[in-house]
Amino acid sequence: MDKFQIQGNGPLKGEIRISGAKNAALPILCAGLLTADTVTIGNVPDLQDTRTMLKLLRQMGMKAEMVDGVATLQGADINSPEASYDLVKTMRASILVLGPLVARFGEARVSLPGGCGIGARPVDQHIKGLQAMGAEITIEHGFIHARANRLKGARVVTDMITVTGTENLLMAATLAEGETVLENAAREPEVTDLAELLVKMGAKIEGIGTDRLVVQGVDRLHGAEHKVVADRIEAGTFLCAAAATLGDIVLRGIPPLILDAVLIKLREAGATVETGDDWIRLAMPQRAQAVSFRTSEYPAFPTDMQAQFMALNAVAEGTARITETIFENRFMHVQELNRLGANITAEGNTAVVTGVPRLSGASVMATDLRASASLVIAGLVADGETVIDRIYHLDRGYDRMENKLSAVGAKILRIS
């Protein structure tokens, strides 16, 4: 099992090109199920999760290839509208095939999902939405089984804001009969990116980027070309690493507008941040100031950046209060950061971080995707050697992280 071996060795300096967003690429790949025509997707990150999704699509009969970050999808010969447990158990986003399959083929069997163990993250909102659109759904033997002659447009109000739920219902609505209105829709840039691809494929969607999406169903969608939006969480992770190490880095290929909440907090921590149309520069001239925040849905502070800012706060001056409102069980990295010398206490959905001048290297274990990233940041600023075990979590969401960090001066090795 692979591990990271990190020697803390001072500031990160240089340039990093940001990859396409995993959380946009996965639903966009599923959108290929909505048409028999060819869909070409650029800027697809080379990750465990994207490879798993392509494998899942192939299992259903789709022709799916990826070369140099470009995925070519051809869904004319799909013969098995089923997502089996062996793949779904490793990746929650597999649920995203449910809406497209039932919309185009009238049937779908999808195993209940797996992925990072950071809370319940129920799929009931997906199911309620599809039922409102006329699907008959049963859950038995660990599978969600959905059937519909043709989905019917409906007004769907989700009980909570759900990113994958919005994406699933949006894809389903494109081929439904009549008008579908999705109220309380997620506004994340990744949802917007999916919607923009669907429009290129012939979908009729109004309200893109808002919490109310209005979809006029069409009889068929056609092929299209699209480029996946940049990964704002990868960008935020590298910015936190630079801030923690008192570095000076430039990120390329990232529009700063999708990272507003993170950049505000980095400036509050004392960083100098400059931006252009598709680049961000961060310089941290002195030890960071502790910053408190509360996670919430976009455009507020993202839950996927909580762990990385906790690592930054661990070596900041002062005390920060972090409140996690999106997922339960998302403080599993606290114990591991404390092994490195951090001073963090967590109770319920709140953590209090009192910054210390130095961390010290130790062996630690990754517990989920973003927790892994926080341990990497901590390892970069710790005295001595840090070894991070179970980095397969990290490989699910970061494209060659060790190579990108090495290029800006980090001493980080992948070892077996």
Swiss-Prot record:
It is found in: Cytoplasm. This is UDP-N-acetylglucosamine 1-carboxyvinyltransferase. The keyword Cytoplasm applies. It catalyses: phosphoenolpyruvate + UDP-N-acetyl-alpha-D-glucosamine = UDP-N-acetyl-3-O-(1-carboxyvinyl)-alpha-D-glucosamine + phosphate. CDD domains: UdpNAET (cd01555). Keywords: Cell cycle, Cell division, Cell shape, Cell wall biogenesis/degradation, Cytoplasm, Peptidoglycan synthesis, Pyruvate, Transferase. Cell wall formation. Adds enolpyruvyl to UDP-N-acetylglucosamine. The active site is at residue 116. Pfam families: EPSP_synthase (PF00275). The modification 2-(S-cysteinyl)pyruvic acid O-phosphothioketal is found at residue 116. GO terms for biological process: cell division; cell wall organization; peptidoglycan biosynthetic process; regulation of cell shape; UDP-N-acetylgalactosamine biosynthetic process. UDP-N-acetyl-alpha-D-glucosamine binds at residues 92, 121-125, 304, 326. GO terms for molecular function: UDP-N-acetylglucosamine 1-carboxyvinyltransferase activity. GO terms for cellular component: cytoplasm. The keyword Metal-binding does not apply. The gene is murA. It comes from Cupriavidus metallidurans (strain ATCC 43123 / DSM 2839 / NBRC 102507 / CH34). Its EC number is 2.5.1.7. NCBIfam families: murA, PRK09369.1. Pathway: Cell wall biogenesis; peptidoglycan biosynthesis. Belongs to the EPSP synthase family. MurA subfamily. Phosphoenolpyruvate binds at residues 22-23.
